[in-house]
């Protein structure tokens, strides 16, 4: 990479950090190419991304962002997992770490808040924004459905009574 490419990469990475709801830093030393590809595909399916960058360039890209506090995590072979949804990157990273001992989560950030390894694991156990939205819509729509059922119940009862009288009249 020449200077111009590095500058462009740092600008791109800085923008990615700014747009991210959460950033996770992990060691990946010893993972095979197929394991890395598996991690990348799982992360992209969930709506996040994985980036391997030189530590020096990542530290420069973090300057001026809310995630600047995690600069100290960048040592050794590190990768960056990030997503706009604050829950996606931690959830995928923690799930992947459960099955791959060589993938070690170092920490991360959510906005201006630095996250320890335990905080990342706790964050991963929360439902995603889409799951929360679905639950909220369900909670809002359930009372409306019940009100509609209560309002329609008397009309349904009247129809059944009239139907019963009609059946009686035919039988007689």
From Swiss-Prot:
Pfam families: Ribosomal_L10. Signal peptide: none annotated. The keyword Ribosomal protein applies. InterPro entries: Ribosomal_uL10, Ribosomal_uL10-like_sf, Ribosomal_uL10_bac, Ribosomal_uL10_bac_type, Ribosomal_uL10_CS_bac. It comes from the Bacteria. GO terms for biological process: translation. One of its GO terms (cellular component) is large ribosomal subunit. GO terms for molecular function: large ribosomal subunit rRNA binding; structural constituent of ribosome. PROSITE patterns: RIBOSOMAL_L10. Keywords: Ribonucleoprotein, Ribosomal protein, RNA-binding, rRNA-binding. Belongs to the universal ribosomal protein uL10 family. Forms part of the ribosomal stalk, playing a central role in the interaction of the ribosome with GTP-bound translation factors. PANTHER family: 39S RIBOSOMAL PROTEIN L10, MITOCHONDRIAL (PTHR11560). HAMAP family: Ribosomal_uL10. Part of the ribosomal stalk of the 50S ribosomal subunit. The N-terminus interacts with L11 and the large rRNA to form the base of the stalk. The C-terminus forms an elongated spine to which L12 dimers bind in a sequential fashion forming a multimeric L10(L12)X complex. This is Large ribosomal subunit protein uL10. It comes from Bartonella henselae (strain ATCC 49882 / DSM 28221 / CCUG 30454 / Houston 1) (Rochalimaea henselae).
């Amino acid at each position: 990479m020449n200077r111009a490419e590095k500058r462009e990469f740092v600008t791109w990475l800085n923008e990615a950090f700014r747009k991210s709801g959460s950033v996770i830093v992990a060691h990946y030393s010893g993972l095979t190419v197929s394991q890395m590809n598996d991690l990348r595909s799982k992360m992209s399916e969930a709506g996040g991304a994985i980036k391997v960058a030189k530590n020096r360039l990542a530290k420069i890209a973090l300057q001026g962002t809310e995630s600047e506090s995690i600069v100290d995590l960048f040592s050794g072979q590190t990768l960056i997992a990030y997503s706009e949804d604050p829950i996606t990157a931690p959830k995928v990273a923690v799930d992947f770490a459960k099955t791959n001992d060589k993938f070690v989560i170092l920490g991360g950030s959510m906005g201006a808040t630095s996250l320890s390894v335990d905080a990342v694991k706790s964050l991963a156990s929360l439902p995603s924004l889409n799951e929360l939205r679905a639950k909220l819509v369900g909670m809002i729509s359930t009372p409306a459905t019940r009100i509609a059922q209560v309002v329609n119940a008397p009309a349904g009862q009247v129809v059944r009574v009239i139907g019963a009288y009609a059946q009686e009249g035919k039988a007689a």
